[in-house]
């Protein structure tokens, strides 16, 4: 049965949690969404197999033990990301079909990554020197969930330019969910201020202009053509767009482009055209021209 409780986050804050009472205990299963879509959070207990793991539970309505903090953040943040997509775009879960949204925390040991696996999210705990537990950042959770949205819409191939666009759209929706700064991952990085910046990609060794696109090998070692590197170029174009048009219009333009116009093999130039067309569809030629200028400024 649906219930409400609270939990302690990685940073020590107390947050409200939508939970469920089942089998004589409280579990991190959010049954509060009017659509009936469930958000469920599991613990892999440092395994990297047999996903999703054990449903996070408590004998009381409070989730306060230190081993539960990563789960509290994952559960709370994902509830916010679900609400963001539903309230702004009427999108019901990543697939718009109300599929349950699953996270597993404590993936592996000192694992320095978070990922969308195709049907759920996984979060490592970080090694403590580069990353702290990766569920502690709202923009990272939004980034991963957006990979799910992309998979079900444009389905951008994860290599070269389409892959860099896949990464960029995840960063941009990460920003739309956490607009207090232009950084991505600032709440989980230990040794540097953030992972990436939309306003200043070069701060984290990313190009911010097409003239500096890096042709990297399409291998695991080469980050599949540098998808996490070359995303700096469309990220800077997004920053330019948002500063010209504001969040409210920009997020509608980006969502329309992703869900209506982009295809698996879209290039940066295709993305520019898709975003210009989306702006024209929604807001007319003046705003479309501002989007065009935002991309011209990064050499595209």
Curated annotation (Swiss-Prot):
Binding-site residues for Zn(2+), renumbered to this chain: 143, 147, 167
Keyword terms of this UniProt record: Calcium, Hydrolase, Metal-binding, Metalloprotease, Protease, Secreted, Zinc
Catalytic reaction(s) noted: Similar, but not identical, to that of thermolysin
Alphabetical list of SUPFAM superfamilies matching this protein: Metalloproteases ('zincins'), catalytic domain
Necessary cofactors: Ca(2+); Zn(2+)
Temperature effects on activity: Thermolabile.
Database matches in Gene3D superfamilies: 3.10.170.10, Neutral Protease Domain 2
Chain segments annotated as coiled-coil in the UniProt record: none
Class of the enzyme per the UniProt entry, highest EC level: hydrolase
Annotated binding of Ca(2+) 2, by residue: 178, 181, 186
Subcellular location: Secreted
Cofactor: record remark: Binds 4 Ca(2+) ions per subunit.
Positions annotated to bind Ca(2+) 1: 139, 178, 181, 183, 186
Protein family per UniProt: Belongs to the peptidase M4 family.
Protein name per its UniProtKB record: Neutral protease NprE
Annotated organism of origin: Bacillus pumilus
Organism phylogeny: Bacteria, Bacillati, Bacillota, Bacilli, Bacillales
């Amino acid at each position: 049965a649906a219930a409400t409780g609270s939990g302690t986050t990685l940073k020590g804050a107390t947050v409200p949690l939508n939970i469920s009472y089942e089998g004589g205990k409280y579990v991190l299963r959010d049954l509060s969404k009017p659509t009936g879509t469930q958000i469920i959070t599991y613990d892999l207990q440092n395994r990297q197999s047999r996903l999703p793991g054990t449903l996070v539970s408590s004998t009381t309505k409070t989730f306060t033990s230190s081993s539960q903090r990563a789960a509290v953040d994952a559960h709370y943040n994902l509830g916010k990301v679900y609400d963001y997509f539903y309230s702004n775009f009427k999108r019901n879960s990543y697939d718009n079909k109300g599929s349950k949204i699953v996270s597993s925390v404590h993936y592996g040991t000192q694992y320095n990554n978070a990922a969308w696996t195709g049907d759920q999210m996984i979060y490592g705990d970080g090694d403590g020197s580069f990353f702290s537990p990766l569920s502690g950042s709202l923009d990272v959770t939004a980034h991963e969930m957006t990979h799910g949205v992309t998979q079900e819409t444009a389905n951008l191939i994860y290599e070269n330019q389409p892959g860099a666009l896949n990464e960029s759209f995840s960063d941009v929706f990460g920003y739309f969910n956490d607009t207090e700064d232009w950084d991505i991952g600032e709440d989980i990085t230990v040794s540097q201020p953030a992972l990436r910046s939309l306003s200043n990609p070069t701060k984290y060794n990313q190009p911010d202009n097409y003239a500096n696109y890096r042709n990297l090998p399409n291998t695991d070692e080469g980050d599949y053509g540098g998808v996490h590197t070359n995303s700096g170029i469309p990220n800077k174009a997004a920053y330019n767009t948002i500063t010209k048009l504001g969040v409210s219009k920009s997020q509608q333009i980006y969502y329309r482009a992703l869900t209506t116009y982009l295809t698996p093999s879209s290039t940066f130039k295709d993305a520019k055209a898709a975003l210009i067309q989306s702006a024209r569809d929604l807001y007319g030629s003046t705003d479309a021209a501002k989007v065009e200028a935002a991309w011209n400024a990064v050499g595209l």
